[in-house]
Amino acid sequence: GSFKYAWVLDKLKAERERGITIDIALWKFETAKYYVTIIDAPGHRDFIKNMITGTSQADCAVLIVAAGTGEFEAGISKNGQTREHALLAFTLGVKQLIVGVNKMDSTEPPFSENRYEEIKKEVSSYIKKIGYNPVAVAFVPISGWHGDNMLEPSSNMRWLKGWKVERINGNGEGKCGSXALDAILPPPRPTDQALRLPLPDVYKIGGIGTVPVGRLETGILKPGTVVVFAPANITTEVKSVEMHHEALTEAVPGDNVGFNVKNVSVKELRRGYVAGDSKANPPKGAENFTAQVIVLNHPGQISNGYTPVLDCHTAHIACKFAEIKXKVDRRSGKSTEDNPKAIKSGDAAIVILQPSKPLCVESFQEFPPLGRFAVRDMRQTVAVGVIKSVVFKDATGRKVTKAAEKATKGKK
């Protein structure tokens, strides 16, 4: 029934009266093909941080541009939100994009085809500069206020022939918004890669013992796996794996699981640790890492020695900007100035970062979810980045439990 989508309409109504989208929320609904989780990316300067936290988990970005007179122009202007959001999504590795041309009811005249075409042309040229390919992007005219063209074609826009996308791995076409969501390509779930499972929490459960939980990002986890927790280097055997209170014979990427480990106390593990397979490309702590960062909204200058908090996967750790190596062009990544004294809002740079405490990260190329981060300071996100390379620590001073030794011996 239509009430399932009432949130989107009610929310847009309330916010239209207030005039602005601010809070971040996780909304879930279903289309014919997918369970969709919407991570709201609010269109207001101070709230870009809300977007970043969610964007690291997104498979597709939906960029909403307002068609109202003057409103679209403000969003796409030199320092408008539309530009910033699209650039952030691309930088953080969200390669699929849908553009919703909203508030079609407030164009002059209402539901104007010319206005839609004008916006489509302008946004296409902008997203192309960022790195998106406009022919692979669905442009969908909608009115959230009245629900036009969101679930089914609208009688107010009879002129609409529909949207088309052309992609190497599958074309798509349709008219309304929900069909554009159905045309998203499901992300590859990397089961053939090494196991990486960042921990958001660790529980102690009576009669069972220590149960770390988290979402598998890559690889496979099953009972009997001898896991290592980086950066602490604790090795132990997995006794059982559960999802939604059911035992699994194996967990795959995307699964949110709890798994029981032997001979490790809950005090030894913490949020931000990463579980991997001790025998197959195991995770390690980082000595330092090189990243490309984009400064979003820092009131002053950032120079060598600056030590904000980095949010990377489930870890929150202070890291020092040990060396700002070069300023680079935001789009091409080419160097424009070597060893700059400082960087400021709007700049992109290659920097070497040094964690103040043990931290496990990976290059974006190899493990995307462990290779992108937000830089936080003064209760806001001041920069975002992707990791280009990591200098790993030597795995010394580690704890290997008896269960791990036994499991390892038995498998020789």
From Swiss-Prot:
- Write out the GO cellular component annotations: cytoplasm
Matching Gene3D superfamilies: P-loop containing nucleotide triphosphate hydrolases, Translation factors
Q: Which keywords are on file for this protein?
A: Cytoplasm, Elongation factor, GTP-binding, Nucleotide-binding, Phosphoprotein, Protein biosynthesis
Checking PROSITE patterns in the record gives: G_TR_1 (PS00301), G_TR_2 (PS51722)
Residues recorded as binding GTP, renumbered to this chain, are D40, A41, P42, G43, H44, N102, K103, M104, D105
InterPro entries reported for this sequence: EFTu-like_2 (IPR004161), G_TR_CS (IPR031157), GTP-eEF1A_C (IPR054696), P-loop_NTPase (IPR027417), T_Tr_GTP-bd_dom (IPR000795), TRAFAC_GTPase_members (IPR050100), Transl_B-barrel_sf (IPR009000), Transl_elong_EF1A/Init_IF2_C (IPR009001)
**Where do the tr-type G domain residues begin and end?**
1-191
* 5-glutamyl glycerylphosphorylethanolamine, modified sites: E250, E323
List locations, semicolon-separated.
Cytoplasm
**CDD domains per the record?**
EF1_alpha (cd01883), EF1_alpha_II (cd03693), EF1_alpha_III (cd03705)
GO MF annotation: an example:
GTP binding
Looking at the keywords, is Nucleotide-binding present?
Answer: yes
Tell me the function of this protein: This protein promotes the GTP-dependent binding of aminoacyl-tRNA to the A-site of ribosomes during protein biosynthesis.
Say which family it is in: Belongs to the TRAFAC class translation factor GTPase superfamily. Classic translation factor GTPase family. EF-Tu/EF-1A subfamily.
Name this polypeptide is given: Elongation factor 1-alpha
